[in-house]
Curated annotation (Swiss-Prot):
Residues 1-19 form the signal peptide. The chain crosses the membrane at residues 472-492. Residues 549-571 have a biased composition (Acidic residues). The gene is CLGN. Residues 317-350 are annotated as: Interaction with PPIB. Residues 263-284, 317-332, 521-548 have a biased composition (Basic and acidic residues). Functions during spermatogenesis as a chaperone for a range of client proteins that are important for sperm adhesion onto the egg zona pellucida and for subsequent penetration of the zona pellucida. Required for normal sperm migration from the uterus into the oviduct. Required for normal male fertility. Binds calcium ions. It is a single-pass type I membrane protein. InterPro entries: Calret/calnex (IPR001580), Calret/calnex_CS (IPR018124), Calreticulin/calnexin_P_dom_sf (IPR009033), ConA-like_dom_sf (IPR013320). GO terms for biological process: binding of sperm to zona pellucida; ERAD pathway; protein folding; protein-containing complex assembly; single fertilization. GO terms for molecular function: calcium ion binding; protein folding chaperone; unfolded protein binding. This is Calmegin. It comes from Homo sapiens (Human).
């Protein structure tokens, strides 16, 4: 039972440690199981990585790797935000094309947001507008928060295909169709998927937000690794959001967005008004209740405690604070600019017991009853809470295919961040999942390969986890101590002292009645044994000789004369004991043979040869 308890305790400790490195809320499979596994060892990394700029294997609407080192086709915004001061309304954030700070892939570059606390806006035109019809929409790109993230976003906007779209004027109010990507402020971690649906009757665009993912997104913002974000919208009005090729959110455009696509069939009548006689009071004062005659409303809630007396030595005329007599006016004090100098106030040393006007403390008034109010009773005229009547919604419509959104023709990043060095790379917009997967294998795969190879060992991971959770050190010590205790208990068990009795008593044999024939047979056997004493003596000597030979083999040293004398004395005493026991048996036989009663005998115990 003790060992079972040890193993149970050890298992619980390991589970506690693993909980720090696992996301309990994630119900989807890990990336290693869903995506193409990449095995990397140090010998492979020692050779030169042959990175090639990804090339799409199928039709794409947009593809950008930034490996050329130039922002060809990208337009920096020159617009200003509305309703803000001119100094902070301009989009003056800086963009650069750089390699990753850590785990660089030779030859691979990305777009990096370089400024803190500034507005950034940059955009590019698609090769051709994407029209929502019978093909899926797949949007994919990479993000790396190289310095973590305090407050800011890394989402993209797909800009509506309109005649007035000018990329130099791209700002926060530019019409977009889809907004997708990570965003964080404080401890609120988000992965946006927002699309703007056009009302078929009014023509007004309304934002529809997909339900939030059911997984913990924190690690994607804090681990400083490059993560792959993918959005898939299908013509059957379903969607999927993937991170590192693992599904983290999916659902229906008809059911899993807020507010829903279809408006309610009925709405409250805006012209309906509550009648003046409508009574919403569930309880009313009892009209039959009368105030008791002895109810005194003039008594205060608290009165002075008359049992308390002013302490002796209380100084009524002394102030609590006095000017510091040791304070001096500074030499650089200018009364024209600083005003009249006054010494700082300090506690009055004379007020050790108390100073100022003394007042007794206040206590609750036992006679206080307060203002009398009649008790409440059920309102017999209660009509319930009034609500306007329902009327048919004049703007109601049915849209069974919300996938058919307005087309878009440009991709833009309009961001504000308190953290710099946000890395973007490998944008692609297409309609085939195989094209996007191949694009990721040629680009993002290399970053993950190198990051996994450079990942710290288990010891460093444990130490890093303990930096944020100091209590883990206790678990580490206990976890390490339990196996040591088990090994110690197995290898060096505690010796239990055995208690030996000085003497052991033998049980006497039970007296069994025997016949005369049996007794005569036993007498013959005893006489035969007495007639051949030499045989027994020779057998005994032979046994003693064998024992002496064994002792000589185990103990090569010769025995001393004293030891030989002791051994011979023991042999003589054993022989005398044996002869004495034989005489006693004869006497017992003779005594049992006489008498008129039934013949009984005590079973005799023969002496063992050793």
């Amino acid at each position: 039972m003790h060992f079972q308890a040890f193993w149970l305790c050890l298992g619980l400790l390991f589970i506690s440690i693993n909980a720090e490195f696992m996301d309990d809320d994630v119900e989807t499979e890990d990336f290693e199981e869903n995506s193409e596994e990449i095995d990397v060892n140090e010998s492979e990394l020692s050779s030169e990585i042959k990175y090639k700029t990804p090339q799409p294997i199928g039709e794409v609407y947009f593809a950008e790797t930034f490996d050329s080192g130039r922002l060809a086709g990208w337009v920096l915004s020159k617009a200003k935000k509305d309703d803000m001061d001119e100094e902070i309304s301009i989009y003056d954030g800086r963009w650069e094309i750089e390699e990753l700070k850590e785990n660089q892939v030779p030859g691979d570059r990305g777009l990096v947001l370089k400024s803190r606390a500034k507005h950034h806006a940059i955009s590019a035109v698609l090769a051709k507008p994407f029209i929502f019809a019978d093909k899926p929409l797949i949007v994919q790109y990479e993000v790396n928060f190289q310095d973590g993230i305090d407050c800011g976003g890394a989402y993209i906007k797909l800009l509506a295909d309109t005649d007035d779209l000018i990329l130099e004027n791209f700002y926060d109010k530019t019409s977009y169709i889809i907004m997708f990507g990570p965003d964080k402020c404080g401890e609120d971690y988000k992965l946006h998927f927002i699309f703007r649906h056009k009302h078929p009757k009014t023509g007004v665009f309304e934002e529809k937000h997909a339900k939030p993912p059911d997984v913990d997104l924190k690690k994607f913002f804090t681990d400083r690794k490059t993560h792959l974000y993918t959005l898939v919208m299908n013509p059957d009005d379903t969607f999927e959001v993937l991170v590192d090729q693992t599904v983290v959110n999916k659902g229906s455009l008809l059911e899993d967005v807020v507010p829903p696509i279809k408006p309610p069939k009925e709405i409250e009548d805006p012209n309906d008004k509550k009648p003046e006689e409508w009574d919403e009071r569930a309880k009313i004062p009892d009209p039959s209740a009368v105030k008791p005659e002895d109810w005194d409303e003039s008594e205060p809630a608290q009165i002075e405690d008359s049992s308390v007396v002013k302490p002796a030595g209380w100084l009524d005329d002394e102030p609590k604070f006095i000017p510091d007599p040791n304070a001096e006016k500074p030499d650089d004090w200018n009364e024209d600019t600083d005003g009249e100098w006054e010494a700082p106030q300090i506690l009055n040393p004379a007020c050790r017991i108390g100073c100022g006007e003394w007042k007794p403390p206040m206590i609750d008034n036992p006679k206080y009853k307060g203002v009398w109010r009649p008790p409440l009773v059920d309102n017999p005229n209660y009509q319930g809470i009034w609500s306007p009547r329902k009327i048919p919604n004049p703007d109601y419509f049915e849209d069974d295919h919300p996938f058919l959104l307005t087309s878009f023709s440009a991709l833009g990043l309009e961001l504000w961040s308190m953290t710099s060095d946000i890395y973007f790379d490998n944008f692609i917009i297409c309609s085939e999942k195989e094209v996007a997967d191949h694009w990721a294998a040629d680009g993002w795969r290399w970053k993950i390969m190198i990051a996994n190879a450079n990942k710290p060992g288990v010891l460093k991971q444990l130490m890093a986890a303990a930096e944020g959770h100091p209590w883990l050190w206790l678990i580490y010590l206990v976890t390490a101590g339990v196996p040591i205790a088990l090994i110690t208990s197995f290898c060096w068990p505690r010796k239990v002292k055995k208690k030996h009795k000085d003497t052991e008593y033998k049980k006497t044999d039970i007296c069994i009645p025997q016949t005369k024939g049996v007794l005569e047979q036993e007498e013959k056997e005893e006489k035969a044994a007495l007639e051949k004493p030499m045989d027994l003596e020779e057998e005994k000597k032979q046994n003693d000789g064998e024992m002496l030979e064994k002792e000589e083999e185990s103990e090569p040293e010769e025995k001393s004369e004293e030891e030989i004398e002791i051994i011979e004395g023991q042999e003589e005493s054993n022989q005398s004991n044996k002869s004495g026991s034989e005489d006693e048996m004869k006497e017992a036989d003779e005594s049992t043979g006489s008498g008129d009663g039934p013949i009984k005998s005590v079973r005799k115990r023969r002496v063992r040869k050793d």
